[in-house]
Amino acid sequence: MSNRTNDLPKLSGIKHLIREMRYHEFSRQSIGIILVSVFCLETSSNSIIPYASNFAISLILLGLATRMYASGFVLKNKELSTTGPYAFVRHPLYTGNIMILIGLCLINGFFWSFVTAFIFLWFYYPTAIEYEDRKLKSLFPDTWEEWASMTPALMPKMDLNGKIFSRLDLRSWSLKKSLIANYEPVIVVYVLVWVFIVLQR
């Protein structure tokens, strides 16, 4: 049994196997990395949306920037990040991933890429979010509840009070956390290399 499911009700048979697969972090990350290359290797010139490539690249860059931004605030299992991107959503790294994946689907241009991405997100992300929330609540019981009640999981609320820039907290961003603790620049370079390959065709 995965340590991610130790606190969950016990299951057996096929239900147990499927749940273990859905909670398996390495599988989720590996498949996500593979999908980047697959979507970029197989591309259609007849894109579903006109000028999709420009919009898609913008979406990918925004997703990468979101990941870089978020990774510079988080220190896994040692502190509860509630500032910067974590003032808007509880899981900004996943938000960035979704933007990147949608952008790659648009670049790919085939219907099957959207179906594949949807199945991937549906299969892995609800359990990943559930586990992260459960873990953080256990590690930081005094602060997690209030923060989670005010902060959505993936989609930020509309900021109507005009304080969005002060909430960004860019001065607290740390390259050391992003580079050393989370290896985020490696992911950025990997995705950008594949996008560059597509653009050279």
Q: Model segments located where?
A:
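Membrane-anchoring alpha-helices and their flanking helix-loop junctions
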Residues: 1-83, 98-201
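Glycine-rich acyl-CoA binding loop
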Residues: 86-87, 91-95
